[in-house]
Structures are given as C-alpha cells and as structure tokens.
C-alpha cells in the first residue's frame, strides 16, 4: 500500500533546510506526531498541507513528492 512507500522527501528537505519537525509542526499548526509520521512516510500530508509545506520550505512540489513512486502503484 502507498503508506509503506517513500512518497515524500520531507525528512530530507527538512535536513537540507536545517529545520526540525517541531518547527514545521508549529508553523503548520499540527502535532509533532503528525509531522513525524509524514517524515517517515507512515502517512502522507493532504494536498493543502503539501502546498503550505512547499511555501514554508521554499521548495517546489515536484521536489517534495516522489511522483515516480505514484506511477508504480
């Protein structure tokens, strides 16, 4: 199932941008546990959150989401 795939690169991008899960959770107004699940790809952020994340981290959606993994499903 999709939850087991690495569909997003959020963890990698946070490291590249020198930001923490806690910082992102505060900026988005969601729990640190939720962000942690997104970072480990055990769940995926909804599209609205993905768009907010791209703005906060100054990245493009194509850099955050691994669309090639979606094609394999």
Predicted regions and their residues:
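A short, Lys/Arg-rich alpha-helix, primarily the initiator
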Residues: 1-20
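The alpha-helix within a helix-turn-helix
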Residues: 14, 25, 54
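Residues in the helix-turn-helix
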Residues: 23, 34, 63
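Recognition helix of helix-turn-helix/homeodomain-like DNA-binding domains
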Residues: 30-44
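DNA major-groove recognition helix of helix-turn-helix
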Residues: 39, 57, 68
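DNA major-groove recognition helix of helix-turn-helix/homeodomain DNA-binding modules
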Residues: 48-63
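Short amphipathic recognition helices of helix-turn-helix/homeodomain-type DNA-binding modules
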Residues: 64-73
């Amino acid at each position: 199932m999709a939850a087991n795939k690495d569909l997003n690169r959020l963890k990698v991008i946070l490291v590249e941008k020198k930001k923490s899960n806690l910082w992102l959770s505060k900026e988005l107004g969601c729990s640190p546990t939720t962000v942690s699940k997104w970072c480990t790809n055990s769940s995926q952020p909804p599209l609205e959150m993905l768009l907010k994340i791209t703005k906060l981290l100054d990245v493009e959606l194509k850099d955050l989401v691994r669309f090639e993994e979606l094609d394999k499903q």
